[in-house]
């Protein structure tokens, strides 16, 4: 199960990156049950609205993700995110599908 965060391009990308990589990601790393985090920067928009970053946070299953969302660590990370990314963030839960 994945928690996916999509970020619109911030007004000040350098300040966003500093807050995100120096503070936010270390806070997220403390969330119980989080197995892996992958951050991708978008380099080209082919169709639709452009985005800045995508972060995929991997959890072993939905129950673990649900539990993680209720932890003090996730609350702290969420409060931190709101301090610099208000209005820029879309959060999604995604389940990996088997290959066809």
Range-by-range predicted roles:
Residues 1-100:
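Macromolecular interaction modules
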């Amino acid at each position: 199960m994945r928690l996916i965060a999509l970020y619109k391009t911030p007004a000040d990308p350098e300040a966003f990156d500093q807050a995100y990589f120096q503070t936010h990601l270390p806070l997220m790393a403390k969330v119980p049950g989080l197995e892996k985090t992958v951050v991708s920067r978008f380099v080209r928009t082919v169709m639709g609205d452009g985005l800045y970053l995508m972060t995929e946070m991997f959890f072993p299953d939905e129950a673990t993700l649900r539990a993680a969302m209720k932890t003090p660590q996730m609350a702290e990370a969420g409060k931190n995110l709101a301090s610099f990314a208000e209005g820029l963030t879309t959060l999604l839960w995604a389940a990996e599908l088997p290959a066809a």
